[in-house]
């Protein structure tokens, strides 16, 4: 059994110092992320996962706009809903209890915790869980994962929920 700190360290990707970078806004680049988390350049899907992961590593949200941000430039892109989709999950046993780990469409693992909570938002007229990430980003829980969670969810007077690190996250 591992400690929560060890699990967080294992899952953590190197964080960019976006707060320290103050580049000029250099305009818009024709990159769009559709509602399924697919990345497009000029209308053509970017199929190389390494390229998408590179772009994702410099992606941030400021106010209501998404940007690819580096120390020297900041380019706006279009995001239809959110840039990432939760496509898989697992529980990890820690000294602090079971931790819910979510895997996004880029095969990156994220720990559901107070720092990265599941929040309910509207998507296509339905209340859906989203995982809140750093730098204003979020990942929508896929329908498949949602139904898997529904099968194991607990309930109380507020509704159905799933637990991570002894905290309840409501599914609807």
Sequence positions of predicted segments:
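Long, non-globular segments of proteins
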Residues: 1-172
């Amino acid at each position: 059994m591992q400690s929560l700190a060890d699990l967080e360290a294992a899952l953590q990707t190197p964080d960019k110092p976006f707060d320290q970078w103050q580049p000029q806004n250099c305009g818009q680049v024709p990159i769009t992320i559709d509602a399924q988390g697919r990345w497009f350049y000029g209308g053509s899907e970017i199929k190389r996962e390494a390229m998408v992961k590179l772009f994702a590593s410099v992606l941030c949200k400021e106010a209501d706009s998404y940007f690819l941000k580096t120390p020297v430039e900041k380019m706006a892109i279009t995001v239809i809903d959110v840039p990432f989709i939760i496509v898989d999950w697992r529980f990890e046993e820690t000294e602090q209890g079971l931790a819910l780990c979510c895997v996004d469409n880029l095969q990156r693992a994220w720990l559901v915790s107070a720092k990265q909570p599941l929040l309910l938002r509207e998507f296509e007229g339905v209340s859906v869980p989203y995982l809140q990430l750093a730098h204003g980003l979020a990942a929508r829980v896929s329908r498949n994962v949602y139904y898997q969670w529904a099968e194991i969810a607990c309930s109380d007077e507020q509704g159905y929920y799933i637990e991570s690190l002894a905290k309840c996250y409501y599914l609807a």
